[in-house]
């Protein structure tokens, strides 16, 4: 299991979700991906995408105008 980070700052909907989806395609089951973004819609969109696609949201938080969502690949 490996840890990866995706910088989706300054991207607007739907790009954070699309970039997340593209990155996850390259990862293995059990890997962890931390997505850093600034689009408030991502706080709902990425967890919804993760659930639909069998991944698990480990955490989501807002800090210094950034949203950090951690997903474990399912």
Q: What residue spans do the PLM features occupy?
A:
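Absolute protein N-terminus
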Residues: 1-2, 74
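Short amphipathic
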Residues: 2-9, 34
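A generic structural signal for beta-strand entry/edge sites
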Residues: 3, 32, 64-68
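Residue-identity detector for glutamine
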Residues: 5, 21, 28-29, 62, ...
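Generic structural detector for well-ordered beta-strands
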Residues: 7, 36, 70-72
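Amphipathic, hydrophobic secondary-structure cores in small proteins
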Residues: 15, 19-55
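C-terminal structural segments of small proteins and small subunits
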Residues: 47-74
